[in-house]
Amino acid sequence: MIDLNTLVQETGAESGLTFNIDGILLESVNLEYDGNVAAMIGMILKMCLEMSEDVNNGDLKQVMIKNKEGIVVANKDEYDNCVALLSKDISKMGLLLRKMDTVFNN
């Protein structure tokens, strides 16, 4: 199992959460409204998974959301367990992507 506190600390992310593909929160670190965030990211992952299957691009592994105020990187494993890291520092994007790839062995 992933140590979410360590993952947040090692990446410098402001917050993180673990949840299942149905958006049910398992754990969160430094995140207000964590249940709502888990539900929304879970829905995004599920929709992207279905789109990936529809266009025959293989299994979905990762979704990145970048906006003016920050970044969200969410990964899903083969058992539909999910981890998301959130940062307001866009310059950490490469570190977040690389660390999540390492954790999930993508």
Can you say where each PLM-predicted feature lies in the sequence?
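Non-catalytic interaction/Regulatory regions outside core domains
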Residues: M1-S15, F19-I21, L25-N106
